[in-house]
């Protein structure tokens, strides 16, 4: 019988003491047991896409446009829109297009939590305790991307939130959060060779990779830097328990959206 003890070591298998085999098997276990979404993931993807389209100022959407944006079927889009409508988040226009209403702080938190639950989470630790800082690893990622590596990976979390909202009241990022849009995880060791995938939810992760179902179109490229969407960043902050900071950020987003709608500069 193969087990993993409290220290994260393999026990009860003749090859468990082999470093390479042990590392491979632990990676497999961590990947397969990481946080995953529930069965309604496609509907939530539609809802998240609608929110992100609104944040990017793309205006009212047809069902067909939503289908194309998130790659979902018509019944899935219809079900998601129906649920969002019942929650009071959507306004239906006379031409059958739909638009997202103003979202309260409570609505933002509800949507972002559901979005976060719709992702697979892979956590990486540094057994040496000498990992690079999150900011240094983010810069390393940007350099790798300039060389064609990890093109569908973007920086989220605290660093990403500060990109969209520089007034975020956090001194330093506790970890590097990355949104993975269909990319593998081999690139992580290029950020810091000592990083190892863990299945222990209590372990202090220095890098957290969120495998998202959000369309890559929402990745923001800015002066050689690659940032996850606003909604991804907000979901990351909630995952870290930074609710007050989330409220500050969504207040800023709502303020900007209101001024943009009125044609004014915030």
Predicted ranges, named:
Residues 1-27, 114-266:
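Long, low-complexity, charge-rich intrinsically disordered regions
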Residues 19-49:
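Short alpha-helical segments that sit at the start of domains
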Residues 39-43, 95-116:
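Short, cationic-aromatic polyanion-contact patches
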Residues 42-46, 62, 76-80:
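Internal, well-ordered alpha-helical segments in soluble enzyme and binding-protein domains
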Residues 50-54:
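Short helix-to-turn junction characteristic of helix-turn-helix DNA-binding domains
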Residues 56-70:
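Short acidic, hydrophobic short linear motifs in intrinsically disordered regions
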Residues 71-86:
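Short amphipathic alpha-helical interaction segments
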Residues 85-96:
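A short, conserved structural fragment
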